[in-house]
């Protein structure tokens, strides 16, 4: 899982796809954090992405760097513990300008049944199940 987070952090921006009804929705994200052995992302409860993940937790993200790309698919489930939110905000201190662990808005999700695929045009894909 460390390889996945390293890739995402080096890419700096990844694109998270969710579904709203029958319409795909994609937006840029930047948080990727390991907490208690799980891959986490962060958003705000007021955002559409939060509502979409609660309605349908199946999601996929994609990032590109240096001629390689990664796709990470799975279910994103909310972890409502303050410890999980604090860990994310400690890993991304710049977020503390907009979020606080106890603000009622900060929300973290972790991947369940995750599958990451790292691909390029020059080598076979590497699949990581987590």
Regions found by a protein language model. Name each.
Residues 1-3:
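Absolute protein N-terminus
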Residues 6-20, 59-61:
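A short, Trp-centered hydrophobic/proline-enriched beta-strand micro-motif
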Residues 15, 39-40, 60, 71, ...:
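General beta-strand recognition
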Residues 29-32, 74-76:
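Hydrophobic/aromatic beta-strand elements that line small-molecule binding cavities or substrate pockets
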Residues 32-67:
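A short mixed-secondary-structure module that forms the rim of ligand-binding clefts
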Residues 71-130:
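Charged, gly/pro-rich active-site loop segments
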């Amino acid at each position: 899982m460390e390889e996945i987070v390293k890739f995402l952090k080096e890419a700096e921006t990844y694109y998270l796809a969710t579904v709203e009804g029958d319409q795909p929705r994609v937006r840029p994200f930047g948080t990727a954090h390991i907490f208690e052995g799980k891959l986490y992302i962060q958003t705000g409860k007021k955002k559409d992405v939060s509502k979409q993940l609660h309605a349908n937790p199946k999601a996929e993200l994609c990032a590109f760097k240096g001629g390689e790309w990664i796709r990470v698919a799975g279910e994103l489930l909310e972890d409502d513990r303050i410890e999980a939110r604090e860990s994310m905000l400690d890993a991304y201190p710049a977020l503390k300008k907009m979020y606080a662990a106890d603000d009622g808005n900060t929300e973290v999700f972790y991947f369940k049944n995750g599958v990451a695929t790292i691909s390029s045009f020059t080598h076979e894909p590497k699949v990581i199940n987590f």
